[in-house]
């Protein structure tokens, strides 16, 4: 077994019949074909619904390392569906994924996903359960004729990068200490409550002294 990451370098003492227990990878090409056939079978089975599955929300990756990027999440939160005017049980039937555990921590993400839901709803061609008796909200016969199965992802998410022009670095930027500033900001956030408590106690003591 090859050494992995920054662990201790092992001294493997192979006493058992280890050559029979070596993990092989001979099924990789056949597995690739099997996955492709399964994707095609699923696309045929769920047609004319999108082959890639339901609509996913735009979420920001966690941690400082990746939070500049956005990607597809698991499902839309209940608040997003409520603002968009879609019932949580209806959402799953019209190709919208729902994740009741997700919470919206900022207005920007909520608005972006509500807009995404509204855009999807406007583009959606909804087939009636009974072709002879279409209900309110179902697409017209002309729209149904135009319906084709979408092969790629539904409303793909793209990371947009704004290119900055080259310019001269200012003296203020040269003197700015990024790491120290981040440490200070974290410390201030951590000690905010303790400092507020101490300030309150000090103010109370001053009032008592004046009395």
From Swiss-Prot:
Cross-link for Glycyl lysine isopeptide (Lys-Gly) (interchain with G-Cter in SUMO2), residue positions: 123, 145, 174, 177
Localization: Cytoplasm
Sequence positions bearing N6-acetyllysine: 16, 177
Taxonomic superkingdom: Eukaryota
Entry-linked Pfam families: Ribosomal_L13e (PF01294)
Homology family: Belongs to the eukaryotic ribosomal protein eL13 family.
Cited function: Component of the ribosome, a large ribonucleoprotein complex responsible for the synthesis of proteins in the cell. The small ribosomal subunit (SSU) binds messenger RNAs (mRNAs) and translates the encoded message by selecting cognate aminoacyl-transfer RNA (tRNA) molecules. The large subunit (LSU) contains the ribosomal catalytic site termed the peptidyl transferase center (PTC), which catalyzes the formation of peptide bonds, thereby polymerizing the amino acids delivered by tRNAs into a polypeptide chain.
Identification of the protein by name: Large ribosomal subunit protein eL13
Organism: Bos taurus (Bovine)
Primary gene name: RPL13
């Amino acid at each position: 077994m090859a050494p992995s990451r920054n662990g201790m370098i092992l001294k493997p003492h192979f006493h058992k019949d280890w050559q029979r227990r070596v993990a092989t990878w001979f099924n990789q090409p056949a597995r690739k074909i099997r996955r492709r056939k399964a994707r095609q079978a699923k696309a045929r089975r769920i047609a004319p619904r999108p082959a890639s599955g339901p609509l996913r929300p735009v979420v920001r990756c966690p941690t400082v390392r990746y939070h500049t990027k956005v990607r597809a999440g698991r499902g839309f939160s209940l608040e997003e569906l409520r603002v968009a005017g879609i019932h949580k049980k209806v959402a799953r039937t019209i190709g919208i994924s729902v994740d009741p555990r997700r919470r919206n921590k900022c207005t920007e993400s909520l608005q972006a996903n509500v807009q995404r839901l509204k855009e999807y709803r406007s583009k959606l061609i909804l087939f009636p359960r009974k072709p002879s008796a279409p209900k309110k909200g179902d697409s017209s016969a002309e729209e149904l004729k135009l319906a084709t199965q979408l092969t790629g992802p539904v409303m793909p998410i793209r990371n947009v990068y704004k290119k900055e022009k080259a310019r001269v670095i200012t003296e203020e930027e040269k003197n700015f200490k990024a790491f120290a500033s981040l440490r200070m900001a974290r410390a201030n956030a951590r000690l905010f409550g303790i400092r507020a408590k101490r300030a309150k106690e000090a103010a109370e003591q001053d009032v008592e002294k004046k009395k």
